[in-house]
Amino acid sequence: MPESLAERARSTLLKAQVLCREVESRIAEVKDRLSQWEKNRHTLRFLVSCLEHQLGFLEQCALRQGIGRALIETEWSQVVLVDLVNEMKLWYDKIQLRLERLDQVENILVADNKHLSHYISQEQALVLKKRLDEVPIIRPQIENIQTQYDTMCKRVRQKLINKRLTEIKTIFDSQFGDELTETAELTEVKPRDLDSIELELVDYINSLTDHFDKCQALEKGLFNDSNEYDELLKIVSADDSQLDDIMKHLLNTIDSTNHQIDKVYEILDIKTKQKTILHGKINELIANCTKYSEYLAIFKGIATSIEKFKEGCMQDIQLTKELYKFYDEFENSYNKLLQEVQRRRALSQKMLGIIKNCENELKTLHDEDQKLRTHFLSENGAFLPETIWPGEIDDLSPLYALDYHIKEI
């Protein structure tokens, strides 16, 4: 009898082990699928969050702050079209008034009556006029950019954020959200149930193994007395009578487990299809974000052109300021030149007066000298041979010769 009990215990244990091994393999596989699904769900949530932040950055930072406020409202509409234009007009008007002033001042130092404006180049004084003439060209460009900006903001808000992103968030919340009963079922309940089933299967195997070990002990007959043997035989016989029920419960448990696993696979297959569809919508929105981000290059190109225009205007304003100062100094220097002319003329007249006085004194001395020479010759000339002072005794030519030139101013 112990031999038959042991054989029956061995056969039941082997059958149970095979059945449990198969279902445990399926449990391990479905657990992996559940774990992977949870990772995919977190990945989807991360992608949705990234998209939300990216669109928020695109709308608020890149568009409204970076382009709307910083460029269009402040830099272009105010700094360039108002402040810069007003400063160019101010200095253009100033330089024109200075040129008009020079055009009114006649150069009295020359005979053709040219004005001071004739002696300077006026081409550089017109650089701001050329810049101001470009403003009507720049202004429509900025207005066009404003229109494009408004359109882009509207599209980002309505099409990308309000429509596509909202749709994606709604789909995620309705299919993968944390608050869903289905999500709790897949992330908490099912894994916990599968863990319980694994423990239950272990209990089945442990119970059958313990029964098999007792049968082997009876078969080997290693007992000190017959009472111990009889007691164990009684226990083993009672357990043997329950083997069919145990196997029936085990099979029911395995069938129930396989049914649960099949249901989980059905749900996961649906979730996989839902994930694929949602991934497609996410990728489509990412592509749209990339496209709109590339559109920002348009604003960058316009910003570069306007910045070059602004830098050129600032350089021309500085040039005009320097010209204004030069024209002012030019008129001042001309007035000082007139003073210098008067000084030279006065000096020339003074020099001429000195020469005239000198001539008068020399003539007086010469007249007196002529009288004295004539008197000397009348008294002594007949007694002096000419050879004693050849060519000089009876020479009445002046003792001086005065040759001068004073420049007329």
From Swiss-Prot:
InterPro entries xrefs: Atg17 (IPR007240), ATG17-like_dom (IPR045326)
GO molecular function, one term: protein kinase activator activity
Keywords: Autophagy, Cytoplasm, Membrane
Membrane topology qualifier: Peripheral membrane protein
GO terms, biological process: autophagy of mitochondrion; cellular response to nitrogen starvation; pexophagy; piecemeal microautophagy of the nucleus; positive regulation of autophagosome assembly; positive regulation of autophagosome size; protein localization to phagophore assembly site
Location within or outside the cell: Cytoplasm; Preautophagosomal structure membrane
SS bond partners: none
GO CC, any one term: Atg1/ULK1 kinase complex
Function according to Swiss-Prot or TrEMBL: Autophagy-specific protein that functions in response to autophagy-inducing signals as a scaffold to recruit other ATG proteins to organize pre-autophagosomal structure (PAS) formation. Modulates the timing and magnitude of the autophagy response, such as the size of the sequestering vesicles. Plays particularly a role in pexophagy and nucleophagy.
Protein family (similarity comment): Belongs to the ATG17 family.
Protein name: Autophagy-related protein 17
Organism the protein comes from: Candida glabrata (strain ATCC 2001 / BCRC 20586 / JCM 3761 / NBRC 0622 / NRRL Y-65 / CBS 138) (Yeast)
